[in-house]
Swiss-Prot record:
GO molecular function, one term: zinc ion binding
Organism: Mus musculus
Compartment(s): Nucleus
Gene behind the chain: Znf786
One Gene Ontology cellular component: nucleus
Protein's name according to its UniProt entry: Zinc finger protein 786
Main location as per UniProt: nucleus
Keywords: DNA-binding, Metal-binding, Nucleus, Repeat, Transcription, Transcription regulation, Zinc, Zinc-finger
Domain of life of the native organism: Eukaryota
CDD domains tied to this protein: KRAB_A-box (cd07765)
PANTHER family cross-referenced by the UniProt entry: GASTRULA ZINC FINGER PROTEIN XLCGF49.1-LIKE-RELATED, ZINC FINGER PROTEIN 200
GO BP term (any one): regulation of DNA-templated transcription
Family as reported in the entry's similarity comment: Belongs to the krueppel C2H2-type zinc-finger protein family.
Function noted in UniProt: May be involved in transcriptional regulation.
Length: 777
């Protein structure tokens, strides 16, 4: 396989020259950097061939002479160096930046009459649409790099990979004496425009050029042109190789980095911060970032000189550029800047103060806030923001809006249109900001961070609402009772106590809600939909908050703990209910009997005693219950399940029954009578005992008007009115109301006359006293 093509390489091929006018526009540090780059390029050529004579430019640099003059007319050195262009360490990136800064004020008006076919030049001269011209073309006098970029595209070093490479370079050298193809005579202010390489249309700002090129990417002509460019690039082999190790590279900049390994030169270092860099162009960019230029009139500092020139251009631009409305916005030479005081920033130069740029050139100013604007419409827009004036009105809903641009978004919401769609899930949105928040939720990104507690949020509004907790800020106040709240939703929920409106009502049960999202959650009760499923136990829930609280059961996380007893809870609401145990607060009162309860569920269950409602019915036996938990415990009996078991082997369907049973083993009697100091194991026993002191008999038989202190006594009594005899004898079939009566009857068949024990006597006496008490009542 043949190696890379070799041809005579001289210092003129890697050098760049300035005219006297261009040299004067360079700053001192840029001149020193240029001299250093030229010396480095010369040392690279010397390392390849020691017999190379010293050029006149290097001699002037070493003697410290002023560098300007007609450098285009130089003698060619007598000796030529035959080497591969791929092995030369050339710093062209820094030279390009020097050219851009020096030729910012010097604009050429030379017209090139040479016409080259772009497709032909691609294969013949190594150039194509969108590439730069060879760096050696730039030393010709009178050719501006800005104009070259405007008509001929960007610039890179071009290496020809054909056998007739030397002949092609001669054709290029003959073309240097003319100018670049396609260069036209333009005025000085038009030379700062950016040109699209596809349609040749000019624009003032680069972001407009980028948007324009994105539009071309959809056209068929652009796709054909780009496909040809890629095919031509693929045909060129990687012939840029290192002579030391033979490694090949696609771009020259990769070879430049690789040559530093062989030469082991000392890396360039910044004289101020002593920071080292791999390449001098990186050091040059570091100089630009650290060195700040200052505007001479407004004393505002900038990082680059282009910002200073742009500031000067805005101050000195003619009046018709500010007032003429016929010029399209993307072709106006100056960027739009707004006031910094009220946070209305423009697209560029956000560090400029209003007094610097706006000064006398902006005739329209806001009287209250002091903001200055280029046109009267901008001033009127800010005035409407502060005064609350609505400029436009929707023809469909008659709603008035501050800005005309909001009218389209508002009409999309009325029609149900969602022009912005998510590519992953297909969900639609009326605004782009809604899509942005949606993508953060899908990706799990939480870019908003609280500096005090370290909690992350996916939306900025969530962070602002969270920070009110740290600041103890309550901006929302009730107009009736003057209570303040952190969130607006809490205020709306509070206002319902004063008779607030509930505009969203359920069509099935008629229940009304303040928010539409609450109505959606309620509709899942009727439809039975449970969209949130636990990934561990596969249990489904109607609400996402309930799912999160359920997942804490698996993780054993208890983020909400009581400050008095240290008990932890998985939900904030459970902690709030627990606080009432310590404080003794009972905020829920029954309107009929004035009894108070700690929980709202307890009040609802109690009210069913007055109404007789039993909404929870067992699907197997049809038995109804007032409380849902009692129905679930009853269903466990049908399945033979006893999830709560004692150490003695006895099982229970409810945990409360297990707790009551454990007191039989421990002997604990937590319920004490305040009058006689007698203690009881169950609360029901205490209530029954207190009836002896008060004489109260709350349980009433509806058939015979008898009253009882205990519910069990009433149920035993009601068996008298029923024809059923649930306890039947197996021998004779006689039925009995009570089980004790059946036991006495069985002794007749067995003829067993046992001596009653003392516990049986006490039991008989208690039954006797209960019957006597029922008869006396």
């Amino acid at each position: 396989m043949a190696g890379p093509a070799r041809f005579p390489l001289t210092f003129e091929d890697v050098a760049i020259y300035f005219s006297e006018q261009e040299w004067q526009h360079l700053e001192a540090w840029q001149k020193e950097l240029y001299k250093q780059v030229m010396r480095t390029n010369y040392e690279t050529l010397i390392s390849l061939d020691n017999g190379l004579p010293k050029p006149e430019l290097i001699s002037w640099i070493e003697l410290g002479r002023e560098l300007f003059g007609s450098w285009g007319e130089k003698k060619k050195p007598d000796k030529e160096t035959h080497c591969s262009i791929d092995d030369v360490h050339v710093h062209l990136a820094i030279e390009e930046q020097l050219l851009e800064s020096s030729q910012r004020a010097v604009k050429s008006e030379v017209t090139c009459h040479s016409q080259l076919n772009p497709l032909e030049s691609r294969h013949s001269f190594g150039l194509a649409v969108g590439e730069r011209v060879d760096a050696s073309l730039r030393h010709d006098q009178g050719i501006s790099l800005v104009n070259a970029q405007t008509r001929c595209g960007e610039a890179v070093v071009s290496v020809v990979h054909s056998s007739s490479e030397a002949a092609q370079r001669k054709v290029l050298s003959s073309h240097r004496t003319l100018a670049l193809p396609g260069l036209q005579r333009v005025s000085s202010w038009q030379s700062t425009q950016n040109s699209c390489p596809v349609c040749r249309e000019n624009s003032w700002e680069k972001n407009h050029l980028v948007k324009q090129q994105k539009g071309h990417s959809k056209s068929r002509s652009y796709r054909v042109w780009k496909k040809f460019s890629r095919q031509a690039d693929a045909k060129q082999p990687w012939s840029i190789s290192c002579l030391g190790c033979g490694k090949s590279f696609r771009l020259k900049q990769y070879l430049v980095r690789h040559l530093d390994i062989h030469t082991r030169k000392r890396p360039p270092q910044c004289p101020k911060c002593k920071m080292c860099f791999h390449h001098e162009r990186t050091l040059f960019s570091h100089h630009l970032k650290n060195s700040s230029s200052q505007h001479p009139t407004c004393d505002t500092s900038f990082r680059t000189d282009s910002s200073v020139d742009l500031c000067q251009q805005i101050q000195e631009r003619p009046a018709f550029w500010r007032e003429d409305t016929n010029v399209p916005s993307r072709q106006k030479p100056g960027p739009s800047l707004d006031c910094e005081d009220c946070c209305h920033m423009g697209s560029k130069l956000k560090g400029l103060q209003c007094g610097c740029i706006l000064g006398e050139d902006r005739p329209h100013s806001h009287t209250e806030y002091g903001n200055c604007f280029l046109s009267q419409s901008k001033q009127a827009g800010l005035c409407r923001t502060h005064t609350g004036e609505k400029a436009s009105q929707c023809p469909e809903s008659n709603k008035r809006l501050c800005l005309r641009g909001l009218q389209n978004v508002h009409q999309h919401g009325l029609r149900g249109e969602k022009p912005v769609f998510c590519r992953k899930c297909g969900q639609g949105f009326t605004k782009h900001c809604g899509l942005t928040e949606h993508t953060r939720i899908l990706s799990g990104e939480k870019s908003f961070w609280c500096a005090q507690c370290g909690r992350n949020f996916s939306q900025k509004g969530q962070l602002l609402r969270h920070q009110r907790l740290h600041l103890e800020e309550k901006p929302f106040q009730c107009t009736m009772c003057e209570l303040r709240f952190h969130l607006k939703s809490r205020l709306r929920a509070h206002q319902l106590q004063h008779g607030g409106e509930r505009p969203f009502s359920c069509s099935e049960c008629g229940r009304a809600f303040t928010h539409q999202c609450k109505l959606r959650e309620h509709l899942r009760v009727h439809s039975g939909e449970r969209p949130f499923q636990c990934p561990e136990c596969h249990k489904s829930f109607r609400l996402k908050g309930v799912l999160k609280a359920h997942q804490r059961i698996h993780s054993k996380e208890r983020p909400f703990s009581c400050g008095e007893c240290g008990k932890g809870f998985i939900r904030q609401s459970k902690l709030t209910e627990h606080f009432r145990v310590h404080s003794g607060e009972r905020p829920f009162q029954c309107p009929e009997c004035d009894r108070r309860f700690r929980l709202k569920g307890q009040l609802l269950s109690h009210q069913r005693l007055h109404t007789g409602e039993r909404p929870f019915q067992c699907p197997e036996c049809g038995k109804s219950y007032r409380v849902k938990a009692d129905m679930k415990a009853h269903q466990l009996l049908h399945g033979g399940q006893m999830p709560f078991s004692c150490q003695c082997g006895k099982g229970f369907a409810k945990q409360s029954k297990l707790v009551e049973h454990m007191r039989t083993h421990t002997g604990e009697k937590p319920f004490q009578c305040p009058k006689c100091d007698k203690s009881f194991r169950l609360k029901a026993q205490l209530l029954s005992h207190q009836g002896l002191h008060t004489g109260e008999r709350p349980f009433h038989c509806p058939e015979c008007d008898k009253n009882f202190r205990e519910k069990g006594h009433m149920l035993r009594h009601q068996r008298i009115h029923r024809p059923e005899r649930p306890f039947a004898c197996g021998d004779c079939g006689k039925g009995f109301i009570y089980k004790s009566k059946l036991a006495e009857h069985i002794r007749v068949h067995t003829k067993a006359c046992q001596v009653p024990r003392e516990p049986d006597i006490k039991k008989r006496l208690s039954q006797l006293f209960a019957m006597i008490e029922a008869d006396w009542s």
